[in-house]
Amino acid sequence: MSDFCDSGEVLAQKGRFYGVYLLCSQSLDARYRGKCYVGFTVNPKRRIGQHNRGCDFGGAHKTSRKGPWQMVMIVHGFPNNIAALQFEWAWQQPALSTRLKCYPELRRKQPRETHFDYNFRIVNRMLGIGPWHRLPLTVRWLESECERGFVVPLPPHVRIVSGKVAITAKQPEQAVASNRSLECHLCMQRVEPAERCRLLGCLRASCPLTCHMLCLASYLLGDQPGQYIPIGGTCPLCELPLSWAELLRRQGGFTETDQDSDDVACDELSDDVPDVDSDVEQQLTP
């Protein structure tokens, strides 16, 4: 699936989107043009506006007066803001990251390599190693002219797509159908009202499977010692092949929309998690 690229805007529910983005400077000043910046956001459209307006309007100090900036790609699908911020830091600091410091070729930009190519090479490697290679991540291209293939093959469950992101406060339709039981089919325990928003079911609409997220994860992991995030398996009821990434995407309130659909006033929405990134610019040598 990682070789497939679709297009169109994605509609993400407020409070459930965590992304790590890459900016490229379009400055007319040769000192800054082509430089890159990695950051974290819960609202990409709002964040790029902040960067281009300057630090007085919420942008980062390192990007002020070095733009205009273009957000060319974003990696999203992280389970929470902590996981996204850890990914952001490792992307910014490959020489210091515990996961990446064993790859000496990532420590610095190669001769004649652009800043964008260097950052792309880092994230390509990151997506293929733990713990990130087991997460249900999506690589989203925001600028078509920057799209390129991945030299290091990505895990098959990682999606490569293109199109913008809009954040909405609208609640998604309930993923758990009304005809499903109020007991977990795996642990046979009653589902408490507070747990219903975290239930998972089968990808087949006619299958009545209802499970706690942890119960289904444990079932799909089976005899994989030391692993905590499943990749996939089969439905315990109807035996349909299941992708853990797709289960979480459906549960997480993501909806694909047409490119010409109306934006959802994402600039006017306040988010539970602020756009606070580490404000670390890539220190690149010529």
From Swiss-Prot:
Region entry Disordered, spans: 255-286
| Location of the GIY-YIG domain | 16-102
Gene3D superfamilies in alphabetical order: GIY-YIG endonuclease, Zinc/RING finger domain, C3HC4 (zinc finger)
Q: Where are the zinc fingers (SLX1-type)?
A: 184-238
Task: Give the matching InterPro entries.
Answer: GIY-YIG_endonuc (IPR000305), GIY-YIG_endonuc_sf (IPR035901), Slx1 (IPR027520), SLX1_C (IPR048749), SLX1_endonuclease (IPR050381), Znf_RING/FYVE/PHD (IPR013083)
UniProt superkingdom: Eukaryota
Q: What is this protein called?
A: Structure-specific endonuclease subunit SLX1 homolog
> Source species, please?
Drosophila grimshawi
